[in-house]
């Protein structure tokens, strides 16, 4: 039995607690190839609640949880919600930036779940949260969640969300699926995946690490039906040929989002996994994950759902309004206008009820007044021989304002002169002249972040 704060329907996420209890012996989690039932998970949640009370962690305080999708982390996250805490998951943040994150979120306690079901809790600050948004959650007795942006385009922003509002969309019962959790637990996509699975009685499957072989090995061994991933990782999956080394017959759906999907990558996935449905997702920490419907498995056009969400297009840019939007940033002004609309900064094409994501406004390259979308150029360059990955960005130029630069990760060693020549020849007749990379470089390190998103500089002269 999960003895949460308040046993009536006013308790936070009471419906989720009741649902977890009803799943009983169903497998909730696969961790290190061991299945853990919902009953065992509920017992772990109860122990974590006892730990929070023993260590005098009061409702309304802020708790940082260090770790990924271990049973202890999942149990503590649930316990924190039921105990009316504001949670700050930390899994992918570099150590150098963690102190600033803890200070920004006014974290009082840091928790370190261990492999044996225990948890060490460290006091960081005995003062209750002072930020007005954090105080508002405490006054309402609502659990909260703080998620930090990657900071790829500047200072990392801290979004504060109301967990009751965020999880409300999962109350409608649906069939559960065996799902590999790939997106990090400190990312909105990871949180969305985790609670989508638990709320519907599905099974969370973890891989030993986030490499193509480890992911495919886990999917084959545990009959995974759903894989949410990023286009960057799916391209790595194709390059590695891991999909052909494992039995993935149970796989039914791959969802992808967080960055534009190259059409060439989508087509290649369709070829190697013809029985798998490919679905594009869309969401942002600030507004949550929208319900979407892809036009087809081989299409980059998608329809944005309207249940709890509204959207409009202003000057080619997507704006959203959401019932589950964040309360605000803890370290930046509110990005919402007076009517609650949020500018996503994503440029889109529109075709009837469908939209196609072109890329961020900050990443567009302005070459002598002509717009270049990095994703379009990358899609073509990925089709070149000996190319594992490529990132396109803008570089300042005194004549045109900017030129296109391409940074390649190669499959086999090749000298830069040869690569520059091949790039020009390959683009001839396939790209307009102003879109052809003028700067061609070879990357020595990975071009993606710990969250498997492309590291991309803002487009010069955008």
Which stretches of residues belong to each language-model region?
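Conserved ATP/PPi-binding loop(s) of AMP-dependent carboxylate-activating enzymes
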Residues: 312-339, 370-372
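Conserved AMP-binding A3 loop
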Residues: 37-39, 136-137, 141-171
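Conserved AMP-binding/adenylate-forming
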Residues: 34, 50-93, 184, 371, ...
């Amino acid at each position: 039995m999960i003895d949460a704060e308040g046993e009536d329907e006013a308790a936070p996420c009471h419906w989720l607690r009741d649902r977890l209890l009803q799943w009983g012996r169903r497998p909730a989690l696969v961790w290190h190839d061991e299945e853990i039932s919902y009953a065992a998970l509920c017992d772990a949640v109860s122990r974590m609640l006892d730990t929070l009370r023993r260590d005098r962690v009061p409702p309304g305080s802020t708790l940082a949880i260090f770790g990924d999708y271990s049973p202890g982390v999942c149990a503590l996250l649930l316990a924190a919600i039921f105990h009316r805490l504001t949670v700050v998951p930390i899994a992918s943040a570099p150590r150098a930036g963690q102190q600033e994150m803890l200070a920004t979120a006014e974290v009082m306690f840091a928790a370190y779940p261990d492999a044996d079901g225990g948890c060490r809790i460290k006091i960081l600050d005995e003062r209750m949260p002072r930020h007005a948004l954090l105080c508002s959650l405490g006054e309402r007795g609502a659990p909260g969640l703080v998620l930090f942006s990657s900071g790829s385009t500047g200072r990392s922003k801290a979004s504060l969300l109301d967990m009751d509002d965020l999880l409300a969309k999962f109350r409608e019962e649906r069939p559960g699926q065996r799902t590999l959790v790939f997106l990090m637990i400190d990312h909105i996509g990871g949180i969305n995946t985790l609670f989508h699975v638990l709320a519907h009685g599905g099974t969370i499957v973890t891989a030993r690490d986030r490499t193509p072989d480890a992911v495919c090995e886990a999917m084959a061994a545990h009959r995974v039906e759903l894989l949410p991933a990023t286009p960057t990782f799916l391209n790595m999956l194709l390059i590695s040929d891991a999909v052909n080394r494992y039995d993935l017959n149970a796989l039914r759906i791959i969802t992808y989002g967080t960055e534009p999907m190259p059409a060439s990558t989508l087509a290649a996935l369709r070829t190697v996994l013809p029985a798998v449905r490919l679905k594009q997702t869309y969401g942002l920490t600030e507004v949550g994950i929208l319900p979407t419907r892809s036009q087809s498995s081989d299409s980059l056009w998608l329809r944005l759902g309207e249940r709890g969400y509204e959207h409009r297009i202003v000057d080619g840019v997507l704006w959203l309004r959401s019932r589950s939007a964040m309360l605000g940033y803890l370290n930046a002004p509110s990005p919402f206008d007076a009517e609650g609309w949020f500018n996503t900064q994503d440029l889109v094409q529109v075709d009837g009820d469908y939209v196609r994501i072109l890329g961020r406004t900050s990443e567009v390259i302005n070459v002598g007044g002509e717009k270049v979308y990095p994703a379009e150029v990358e899609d073509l360059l990925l089709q070149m021989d000996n190319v594992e990955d490529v990132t396109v960005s803008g570089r300042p130029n005194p004549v045109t304002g900017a030129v296109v630069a391409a940074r390649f990760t190669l499959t086999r060693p090749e000298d830069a002169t040869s690569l520059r020549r091949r790039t020009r020849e390959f683009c001839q007749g396939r790209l307009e002249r102003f879109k052809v990379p003028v700067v061609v470089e070879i990357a020595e390190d990975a071009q993606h972040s710990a969250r498997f998103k492309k590291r991309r500089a803002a487009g010069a002269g955008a």
